[in-house]
Regions:
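Alpha/beta catalytic barrel-like cores
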Residues: 1-151, 158, 168-169, 175, ...
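Short, hinge-like loop/turn segments at secondary-structure boundaries
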Residues: 150-152, 273-274
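Extended substrate/RNA-proximal surfaces in nucleic-acid metabolism proteins
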Residues: 164-167, 173, 179, 202-209
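Aromatic- and glycine-enriched pocket-lining scaffold segments that form the walls
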Residues: 180-190, 194
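Short linear capping/connector segments at secondary-structure termini
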Residues: 188-190, 227, 326
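Acidic/histidine-rich catalytic cores of soluble enzymes
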Residues: 192-303
Length: 417
C-alpha cells in the first residue's frame, strides 16, 4: 500500500471516529504499549533442541508437514526475526525449557542452568525484545502420564527440580533485561481412563507446587495453567481450572487462561472479569481451538474480539499479559506468526475504537435497541484504516503487503532447508 493512501484513509477514519467520540490517536498510543509474547515453538512444531528426533508427547499434537521447519537455534532465531519484522509494535518472546543453547551436549532437564539461555538473553537484548519462560514437562522419558503429580517420589523430585531451575532461569532473564519474565507452569498430568484417586493426585500436585514456590524469584511473574484434557489423557486432568484458580488466588500467582484449554462451549472471555476481581494479574494464551485444543493459527474471530473487549473495557491492559500459543505445521510458519499476531492486535484495536462510553450510557438508560445497534455499526467502522496506519507508523508492511515478504523469505531461506 502507498503511504499517501494510508495517510489519507487514516485521516478520514479519524474524522469518522471523532463523530462517535473516539480518539484514534489515543487508541494507537494504547495499542503501541501492548507487547505480545510470541511463542518460539511455532518455528519448529514444538521440537526444541534437547532431542530433535524425539516424539511430541503430553497430549499435544502438531499436525502437518509444511517444508521449511527450523532445525536449530540459528534457524529458529532467524525465523522469529523475520516474523518480528512484519509485526508492528515491540514484543516479547516466550521460550520453553527445551530450547536451551545446549551446544550439542546432553543436558537433562533437572540440570538446566541460566548459562544455557544466556545466548537467548543476549539475542533478545540485541533484538529489542524481552523474554518469558516455560518449564517443559512433556516429550521426556520421565514424562509418562504424570510429572509433578507422580506418586513415585523420585520422578516427582525430578520434575520439581526442573521447575525450580526453570524459574531461576526466568529470574535471570528478567534481571538482565530489566523486565519481569512471566514463568508459566503447565503440566500434562492426567489419566486416559477413570481414576479413583483424584484427591491424591491433586494433593501431590499441590505439594510439588509448594516446593517449587519456596524459592523466591523477584524478577518473575509466576503463572499456573489449567487444561480440560489432552489426547490420551481424556478422562482426568490433575491441573483443572478449579485447582489452578484456587491455587493462584490463594498464593498470589497468575492464573493462565488458554483459549483452547476449556470445553468448546466455554468462553474464556467471560472468565476475564471474574479473575481480575480476585487476582492482580492474569496471563492469556491466545489460540484457536477447532473442536478441541487443536492450536490452529489465531484469526480475527468473535472469540478473540470478545476477549480483547473484556480486557480493554475493564481498563485492565496493564494487568493482563498476552501471549500467543498455537503451532500449525500445515502452512508457512512465519506467515502463521504474522497472521495470528496481527489478528490479536486488530481485536484490541477494535475494542479501543468502540464507543464504550456511549454504549454504557445506553445500557444504563435501558436503551437496549440503541446499544445493540451501535455495537453492530462499530463492526463496520473504518478500523482497518487505523490499523494500516499503525503498521506504517511502525515501519512494517500494511494490509496484505506482508504476504510477498513471507513468500520471498520462503524462496530464499526456508525452502532451502
Amino acid at each position: 500500500m502507498k503511504q499517501d493512501q494510508i495517510i489519507k484513509a487514516y485521516e478520514a477514519a479519524k474524522a469518522r471516529y471523532a463523530e462517535t467520540g473516539v480518539d484514534t490517536d489515543a487508541a494507537l498510543a494504547a495499542l503501541q504499549r501492548i507487547s505480545l509474547s510470541l511463542h518460539c515453538w511455532q518455528t519448529d512444531d514444538v521440537t526444541g533442541f534437547e532431542n530433535p528426533d524425539g516424539q511430541l508427547t503430553g497430549g499435544i499434537q502438531a499436525t502437518g508437514n509444511y517444508p521449511g521447519k527450523a532445525r536449530n537455534i540459528d534457524e529458529v532465531r532467524a525465523d522469529i526475526e523475520k516474523a518480528k519484522s512484519l509485526i508492528p509494535g515491540r514484543h516479547r518472546l516466550s521460550l520453553h525449557a527445551i530450547y536451551g543453547d545446549f551446544k550439542g551436549k546432553k543436558v537433562d532437564r533437572d540440570q538446566i542452568e541460566p548459562e544455557h539461555f544466556q545466548s537467548w538473553i543476549d539475542w533478545a537484548r540485541a533484538n529489542d525484545m524481552k523474554l518469558d519462560f516455560n518449564s517443559t514437562s512433556f516429550s521426556h522419558p520421565k514424562s509418562g502420564d504424570l510429572s509433578l503429580a507422580n506418586p513415585d517420589r523420585a520422578v516427582r523430585d525430578f520434575w520439581v527440580e526442573h521447575t525450580v531451575r526453570s524459574r531461576r532461569i526466568a529470574d535471570e532473564m528478567g534481571r538482565q533485561l530489566g523486565s519481569k519474565a512471566c514463568h508459566n507452569i503447565w503440566v500434562h498430568d492426567g489419566s486416559k481412563d477413570l481414576t479413583v484417586n483424584r484427591y491424591h493426585y491433586r494433593s501431590l500436585l499441590r505439594e510439588s507446587l509448594d516446593r517449587v514456590f519456596e524459592h523466591k524469584c523477584p524478577n518473575v511473574k509466576d503463572a499456573v495453567e489449567c487444561k480440560l484434557f489432552g489426547t490420551g489423557l481424556e478422562s482426568f486432568t490433575v491441573g483443572s481450572h478449579e485447582f489452578y484458580m484456587g491455587y493462584a488466588v490463594s498464593h498470589g500467582l497468575m492464573a493462565t487462561l488458554d483459549m483452547g484449554h476449556f470445553h468448546p462451549t466455554e468462553d474464556v472471555y467471560d472468565k476475564i472479569s471474574s479473575m481480575l476481581l480476585f487476582s492482580p494479574e492474569i496471563l492469556l494464551h491466545v489460540s484457536r481451538p477447532v473442536r478441541w485444543d487443536s492450536d490452529h493459527v489465531v484469526i480475527f474471530n468473535d472469540s478473540v474480539q470478545m476477549l480483547a473487549q473484556e480486557i480493554v473495557w475493564a481498563g485492565a491492559l496493564d494487568r493482563v499479559n498476552v501471549g500467543l500459543d498455537y503451532f500449525d505445521a500445515s502452512i508457512n510458519r512465519i506467515g502463521a506468526y504474522v497472521i495470528g499476531s496481527r489478528a490479536t492486535q486488530k481485536a484490541f484495536l477494535l475494542a479501543m475504537l468502540t464507543p464504550i462510553g456511549k454504549l454504557r450510557e445506553y445500557e444504563a438508560g435501558g436503551r437496549y435497541f440503541e446499544r445493540l445497534a451501535l455495537l453492530e455499526e462499530s463492526k463496520s467502522m473504518p478500523w482497518a484504516d487505523v490499523y494500516n496506519y499503525f503498521c506504517m507508523q511502525n515501519g512494517v508492511p500494511a494490509g496484505e503487503d506482508y504476504i510477498a515478504d513471507v513468500e520471498k523469505y520462503e524462496r530464499e531461506v526456508t525452502s532451502k532447508r
